[in-house]
Amino acid sequence: MKVKEICDYSGSTLLGMNGGMVESPDSKRIIYARKADLTKSETEIWICDRDFENHRKVYDVHCGNHNGPSATFITNSLIVFRDVEFEGIAGKEPSICVFRILDVDTGEVKYKIRGKESHCA
């Protein structure tokens, strides 16, 4: 087995978690996140071909390091991921967690689900 980096990048790369599908159902694409500075919440969601070519950023999010954006394929073109919407003073205080469903081919957010995120039911 040969180990290969997802991309040539000096920051951290993150893959999905909790059983998420980092590979599209047709096995043609891989989704991952890039985080330039682990002390900040800014994170980018990227996709590439299965052979690790044709990398492209699909969305900018804010998330912590523990769970990351948990980006996951739903269909060959739809992904779901975690983000935070900022409001409050100067738009810098996190207000609520958001899960977005994005069409990676068009860049359109199809659905936005807002709610309190917690480990408690």
Where are these regions (language model features)?
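Sequence signature of WD/YWTD-type beta-propeller architectures
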Residues: 1-121
